[in-house]
Amino acid sequence: MAARPARHVLALPECGAPGDGGANARALVLDTNIVLDLLVFADAAMAPVRTLLDAQRLCWVATPPMRDELARVLAYPQIVPRLAFYGLTAGELLESYEAQVRWVDVAPRISAVCKDADDQHFIDLAVAHRAILLSKDKAVLCMQKRLLVLGAQAATAIVFEASGWTGISHRGPVATTSDMQAA
């Protein structure tokens, strides 16, 4: 019996196509902890994000206040030794960040308010750009339905297989394309 598709995976057919030079790339907003997973810790769960960014199927959008928040986090006493362990400096990491993002204006505040005020600017930007917002923050993830109505999606990870992008994962195990076809 084939596995049923996980309810937490959403198909995203509107994603940019390979080889279109990023012209139709889907906007992506990363909260600060996800940025650390991508740029510092090389978290395996971030491999699909890296692949899709490199292929210009996603366009990482950010604002100067998001960069400032990252700079502040990189100075935290618990982060500094981790940077050193990976042979990185805060300056190098910020340069890498700046080279990879598309700078945009701070988005206007939306009607959906996050319980964690520190995360509101990520939500506002995701809605303004009809973006995927990757976050592990429960205050953000509990807003999934409200964000969908506003044209944005919140998730913890992007799912990618050899056959292509299957969707985004909100939590838990991930359904694959073959699981979805068998259901």
Language-model region placement:
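Short, well-structured N-terminal submotif of metal-dependent ribonuclease cores
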Residues: 1-62
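Divalent-cation
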Residues: 2, 98, 118, 157
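Acidic, PIN/NYN-like endoribonuclease modules and their adjacent C-terminal/linker elements
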Residues: 11, 16, 113, 120-123, ...
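Alpha-helix capping/helix-boundary segments
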Residues: 34-35, 66, 139-140
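Short, flexible loop segments at the rims of nucleotide/cofactor-binding pockets, characterized by
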Residues: 37-39, 83, 108-115
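Residues that scaffold the ATP/ADP-binding catalytic core of kinase and kinase-like folds
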Residues: 37-39, 73, 82, 143-144, ...
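Residues at secondary-structure transition points
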Residues: 44, 61, 88, 113, ...
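PIN-domain endoribonuclease scaffold, especially VapC-family toxins
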Residues: 52-109
